[in-house]
From Swiss-Prot:
UniProt record similarity statement: Belongs to the DTD family.
Region forming the signal peptide: none
Protein name, entry field: D-aminoacyl-tRNA deacylase
Assembly and oligomerization: Homodimer.
One cellular-component annotation, GO: cytoplasm
Organism: Citrifermentans bemidjiense (strain ATCC BAA-1014 / DSM 16622 / JCM 12645 / Bem)
Length: 149
């Protein structure tokens, strides 16, 4: 499982011109589910992102996590994160999870974020989406779950 995390002042996702998810201060998470990912990877990713200390404290240091700043999450499914561009000019998506499994784990991930006390909004799985955001920093991280054993 891979994620791109961006600290934002605000973010929204629209489908066919209609806003389907919107947050204020928090993180935009682009989430890619790969073959072999399961609940353990989604749990790890939710725990890591919710508790990642990427917000400034009173001294300006990155020392606070989403719950401490009352931040929100906008989660957007992004199968292209599983893309392999090492050969040729067209990406290969051989490692992307099947849509049914990816949707199940995407939904499970969002549930785990909610259970950890962070409000989460989302896009629509497999929809053609437009994502708008105001970066804060910018601060961007790429996370990948530890290798499966």
């Amino acid at each position: 499982m891979k994620a791109v995390i961006q600290r934002v002042k605000e973010a929204k996702v629209s489908v066919e011109g209609r806003v389907v998810g919107e947050i204020g201060k928090g993180v935009l998470v682009l989430l890619g589910v790969e073959i072999g990912d399961g609940c353990a990877q989604a749990d790890w990713m939710a725990e890591k992102i919710v508790n990642l200390r990427i917000f400034a404290d009173n001294e300006g240091k990155m020392n606070l996590a989403l719950p401490e700043v009352k931040g929100e999450m906008l989660a957007v499914s992004q199968f292209t994160l599983a893309g392999n561009c090492s050969k040729g000019r067209r990406p290969s998506f051989d490692t992307a999870a099947a849509p049914e499994e990816a949707n199940r784990l995407y939904s499970y991930f969002m549930g785990q974020v909610w259970e950890r006390g962070v409000p989460v909004q989302s896009g629509i799985f497999q929809a053609d989406m437009e994502v708008s955001l105001v970066n804060d920093g910018p601060v961007t991280f790429i996370l990948e779950t530890p290798p499966k054993r």
